[in-house]
Amino acid sequence: MFDRSLNRVNERLNRTLTRNQLLQQATDQTRWQLRVSRVVIYYFYREWKGQVIIESLSQSEFSILGSTGADDCFNGDYAQRYLQGRILQITDIEASDFDPCHLDFLRSIRVRADLVAPIIVDQRLWGLLAAHHHEVRTWLAEEVEFVRQQAQTLAGDLQLMD
């Protein structure tokens, strides 16, 4: 009985390690491809409450690992748009129509340009793949498509792991 319990714990641990390795590779690849300051995966652990669980950085000063983000700003309306496949692309947050709550949060983590794609697993919003840049940046169509495809690939891989 003890051996079986230990095996189950080890299996869960291996799945978690494999999942985290997959997510880390995807964020590293995305940051390298886009040449941005930071790429993160924001995971929703309950309805519209989440945390940055993986990040890839150009410089350690950009770290927000473990951040719970602007949970008070994110709501069902935002979630619904992402569930419908919305890709958020902002060239300059200062010229955007973000609400003050969201804008203040992005400023606090030194985001100037933002590109975000949903990670949808089993028809639920599992998380967000977000590319942040500390300077104004115009996102190219192929960059937007790359991030969309990365998020879809991650969603498929995560679904297979569960």
Swiss-Prot record:
Organism: Picosynechococcus sp. (strain ATCC 27264 / PCC 7002 / PR-6)
PROSITE patterns assigned to the protein according to its UniProt record, in alphabetical order: PHYTOCHROME_2
Pfam family, one: GAF
InterPro entries: GAF, GAF-like_dom_sf, Phyto_chromo_attachment
Protein name: Uncharacterized protein SYNPCC7002_A0852
